[in-house]
């Protein structure tokens, strides 16, 4: 650890392997929704609320996953993950910066959008496939509003603006 750390790069150890992985998955889905928020003229305040809801969903999914005992962590460790660079830091960057393919997909989600064309223009969008996988296994993973909202927009063709309004009810 000491051999590779610098002033600009710090390693933070965690036992919460599941939480870090779930953070990466939900972060991509959240970035799609953050792009849709921006495209539909929501303020950054709503993206911050989205991030908070996303952290709640990460905690919910992580705490419910039935995993091997050696990977289980207590609530304190999961909360530490939520505020770590692996979760909060990565989510902020991905939700606010237009270089994210997931956010760019969301930016294309306005009114009558052509999802196939948007995906063709961007290429691989991890959050798109993750949304389907989590939704298909929703009972197992105890998904919440983030995954459901993304699924309603991306796979059910529901109006993005009305889905986003429901997200914050």
Model-derived regions: residue spans:
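C-terminal active-site/capping subdomain that shapes the small-molecule cofactor and substrate pocket
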Residues: 97-169
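Internal helical hairpin/lid segments
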Residues: 81-107
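Internal alpha-helical scaffold of NAD(P)-dependent oxidoreductase catalytic cores
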Residues: 1-80
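Short, small-residue-enriched loops and turns at beta-alpha junctions
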Residues: 20-21, 93, 123
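Charged/polar, low-hydrophobicity segments characteristic of intrinsically disordered regions
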Residues: 59-89, 131-137, 167-169
